[in-house]
Amino acid sequence: MCAQYCISFADVEKAHINIQDSIHLTPVLTSSILNQIAGRNLFFKCELFQKTGSFKIRGALNAIRGLIPDTPEEKPKAVVTHSSGNHGQALTYAAKLEGIPAYIVVPQTAPNCKKLAIQAYGASIVYCDPSDESREKVTQRIMQETEGILVHPNQEPAVIAGQGTIALEVLNQVPLVDALVVPVGGGGMVAGIAITIKALKPSVKVYAAEPSNADDCYQSKLKGELTPNLHPPETIADGVKSSIGLNTWPIIRDLVDDVFTVTEDEIKYATQLVWGRMKLLIEPTAGVALAAVLSQHFQTVSPEVKNVCIVLSGGNVDLTSLNWVGQAERPAPYQTVSV
């Protein structure tokens, strides 16, 4: 694996050893109805059943355990991060396991259920405006005040390596898999998965999926350079509002085969399909990946890509904000970038 990347496959292997005793081996489920709709064999990696309700515990726990020194006296005074909710919950849970205080910078617009969950796990919440600039500024201030160590939600190498353990499990659970489809925000999960897949089974495709309202990953691939969102994105998929960053971009640029964008209606439709057909209460961010596969444009993907694994990234749903339920129409075509 090229030395220009922030992690190697060896880091993912170490992460697997580091965290496997404290996370769930999440199931892979199928749906014959969704297979018929998609025209492919779909396999759903159910990270909504993971501890803290999303895949984020993998990276958070790997990062926290990497901070634990040989002597208790050297333990960090605190850990700090910014998060729309899921990473904040995961980091707080992981830090609590090791007896470390956690401070989470949360956008004021984050779902209420996620804010309450972060508090329930024992973190101190600090609010910020829903922009990358505000998050970074407030995070730096809290780090100075607490003398805490930053655990970035998607650019920290230990976090990326932890998320890559998803792919290790998928290759064992679905040995004939042809492709993985992963929702992308900051890119930690898709980068970790891409590193793992291309090291172990490079013929398997890795596709990223994101809202068209937050399409920095698509734009970056299109232009061949890192192109962050200029304005705070408006999307119901709150877990993928962040832009990809300096550590995830090179991996995405080189190892992710395609980036698909989907509309808000497509996300709503796909999310409700999973609710109705599979009886799984996923959050809209998890619906982004299925929305990509159900789009007409995905039909241009080779029919040889028959067995497709979709990562259902989380299930932390704010039930009080579901005023859009029943409003979505069937998906329409969307964009893709081929490399």
From Swiss-Prot:
This is Serine racemase. Its EC number is 5.1.1.18, 4.3.1.18, 4.3.1.17. The lineage of its organism: Eukaryota, Metazoa, Chordata, Craniata, Vertebrata. The gene is Srr. Ca(2+) 3 binds at E210, A214, D216. Mg(2+) 3 binds at E210, A214, D216. Changing C113S: Abolishes S-nitrosylation. Pyridoxal 5'-phosphate binds at N86, N154, G185, G186, G187, G188, M189, S313. Ca(2+) 4 binds at N247.
